[in-house]
């Protein structure tokens, strides 16, 4: 996983000022991952759709272009492609999988159905350890997923590698700075894949590694100050890392011009309310208004078991509560002769990509953590994290001096524990789940696993009664489900292989300390087919 330790911290300045690396998305499931890997190499990257006209692509002044994989076959009618002007532009281009085939096909190479499709782990023979394959061993373990192969490279290209099913598995035309590879260097199953990407960026395209947390902060602080001037700003804190880092970054830029609102809906994990009210404020000095609305939320949720209805009630209740606090902020600012003009949101780059948004989006995007903010708020948006992935946000939080407990907090849904109780939400059930969840998080942290696991939802099957024996007595309790998952972006996930001794400790503690729980079970399902959250 990308982490602050992996972000280069030796160079200030920011490569996006000199033009980004553009990742052209042909519908690949790994397109965002390619962009992340470029960032890990210390170079700023952006995703663009393959349908973007080539003149618009080149108008962005890209310093390099990467063509992603995709599900199509290049020789089928209507298959997505790219204008050959890209290859004639002088900009270094790397084609990956389908993007590699597009490059070969459009430049006159021979592409056809593979005699042998290759899926999964595949050994590649390196014919020339140069360019993108500089310093490569004679054989590489790679990750393939193709039923179409480049059988002959276009004129001017040198074959760098082959596999049993791909006569041309990697190629290069150094004179035009064009490169292609059939396997997926962006996935962890290609152990030397990151080295290939770094070779392309630093050796072939001669790009510096100047995308780092310090330069991002410096750049954003300058932009925020220019945007805000002497106006005042409001930010809704959800308790999650995104809104916390966004608020800390804006506060670094404008100080007391920022007021944060934290709505305690009573559905947070153990200690989180205190963490926001005390630790976050102590670390940042931010002015915070806390609204204790726990009883209001519980009253609104009484008797409700259906998951979508829970979400809707929580979202609507949050909006109404935030609006009330917002009026207080506006009145206080008015009394000082000030005007609140801006709203901070912790929008991340995946949110922008998945919503099809671009620069300068005017409408307020529904906040994925809190169920949506009022659509009629007359504020201008400040979204200081909208070019960043989650792990870059963590790096910035660390650089800003936020406590690890906030920066490394596991992702948590806006409806909170409300959608981790299968059944009606009551105060007693919330208290029970809160204790069990705290035990699981504490033991995972003790075992040093809290940064290896993306998140570990703890789910209370409140409407299920499990037979048990506790203290020589027959009991009917509720089962608890542990759902530890590993992921890079939450779009896909695998269940985490938590050591048995850690699981045993968690199970023993929960059943001993939470007497209404007599069974702990492990959810070992990947996403897909299952989602990370149960509701």
From Swiss-Prot:
Protein's organism: Bifidobacterium longum (strain NCC 2705)
Catalytic reaction equation(s): XMP + L-glutamine + ATP + H2O = GMP + L-glutamate + AMP + diphosphate + 2 H(+)
EC number: 6.3.5.2
Phylogenetic placement of the source organism: Bacteria, Bacillati, Actinomycetota, Actinomycetes, Bifidobacteriales
Role of this protein: Catalyzes the synthesis of GMP from XMP.
Annotated gene: guaA
Stretches assigned to the GMPS ATP-PPase domain: 211-409
Active site: 97 (nucleophile), 184, 186
Protein name: GMP synthase [glutamine-hydrolyzing]
CDD domains according to UniProt: GATase1_GMP_Synthase (cd01742), GMP_synthase_C (cd01997)
Pathway terms, separated by semicolons: Purine metabolism; GMP biosynthesis; GMP from XMP (L-Gln route): step 1/1
Keywords of the record: ATP-binding, Glutamine amidotransferase, GMP biosynthesis, Ligase, Nucleotide-binding, Purine biosynthesis
Subunit structure: Homodimer.
InterPro entries per record: Class_I_gatase-like (IPR029062), GATASE (IPR017926), GMP_synth_C (IPR001674), GMP_synth_GATase (IPR004739), GMP_synthase (IPR022955), GMPS_ATP_PPase_dom (IPR025777), NAD/GMP_synthase (IPR022310), Rossmann-like_a/b/a_fold (IPR014729)
């Amino acid at each position: 996983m990308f982490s602050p330790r992996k972000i280069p911290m030796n160079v200030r300045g920011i490569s996006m000022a000199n033009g980004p690396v553009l990742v052209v998305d042909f519908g690949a499931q790994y397109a965002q991952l390619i962009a992340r890997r470029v960032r890990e190499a210390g170079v700023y990257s952006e995703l663009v759709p393959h349908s973007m006209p080539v003149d618009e692509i080149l108008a962005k002044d890209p310093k390099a272009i990467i063509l992603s994989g995709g599900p199509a076959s290049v020789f089928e009618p209507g298959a997505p492609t790219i204008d050959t002007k890209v290859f004639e532009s002088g900009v270094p281009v790397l084609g990956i999988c389908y993007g590699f085939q597009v490059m070969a096909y459009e430049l006159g190479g021979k592409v056809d159905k593979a005699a042998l499709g290759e899926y999964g782990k595949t050994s590649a023979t390196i014919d020339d350890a140069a360019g993108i394959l500089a310093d490569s061993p004679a054989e590489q373990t790679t990750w393939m997923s193709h039923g179409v192969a480049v059988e002959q490279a276009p004129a001017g290209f040198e074959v760098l590698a082959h596999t049993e099913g791909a006569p041309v598995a990697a190629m290069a035309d150094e004179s035009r700075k064009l490169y292609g590879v059939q396997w997926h260097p962006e996935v962890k199953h290609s152990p030397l894949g990151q080295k290939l990407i770094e070779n392309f960026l630093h050796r072939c395209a001669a790009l510096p590694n100047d995308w780092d947390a310090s330069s991002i902060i410096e750049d954003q602080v300058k932009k925020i100050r220019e945007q805000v001037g002497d106006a005042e700003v409001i930010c809704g804190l959800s308790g999650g890392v995104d809104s916390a880092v966004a608020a800390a970054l804006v506060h670094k830029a404008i100080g007391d011009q920022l007021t944060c609102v934290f709505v305690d809906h009573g559905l947070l994990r153990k200690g989180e309310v205190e963490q926001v009210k005390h630790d976050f404020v102590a670390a940042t000095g931010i002015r915070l208004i806390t609204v204790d609305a726990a009883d209001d939320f519980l009253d609104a949720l009484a008797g409700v078991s259906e998951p979508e209805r829970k979400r809707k009630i929580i979202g609507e209740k949050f909006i109404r509560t935030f609006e009330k606090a917002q009026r207080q902020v506006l009145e206080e600012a008015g009394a000082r002769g000030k005007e609140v003009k801006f709203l901070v949101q912790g929008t991340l780059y995946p949110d922008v990509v998945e919503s099809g948004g671009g620069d300068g989006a005017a409408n307020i995007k529904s906040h994925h953590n809190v169920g949506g903010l009022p659509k009629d708020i007359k504020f201008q948006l400040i979204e200081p994290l909208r070019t960043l992935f989650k792990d870059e946000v963590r790096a910035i939080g660390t650089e800003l001096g936020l406590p690890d407990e906030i920066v490394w907090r596991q992702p948590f849904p806006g409806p909170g524990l409300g959608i981790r109780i299968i059944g009606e939400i009551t105060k007693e059930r919330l208290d029970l789940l809160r204790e069990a969840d705290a035990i699981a998080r504490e033991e995972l942290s003790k075992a040093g696993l809290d940064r290896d696991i993306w998140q570990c939802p703890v789910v209370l099957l409140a409407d299920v009664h499990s037979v048990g024996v506790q203290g020589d007595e027959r009991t009917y309790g509720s089962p608890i489900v542990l759902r530890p998952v590993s992921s890079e972006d939450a779009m896909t996930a695998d269940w985490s292989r938590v050591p048995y001794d850690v699981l045993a400790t968690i199970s023993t503690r929960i059943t001993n300390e939470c007497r209404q729980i007599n069974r702990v079970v492990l959810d070992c399902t990947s996403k897909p087919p299952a989602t990370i959250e149960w509701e």
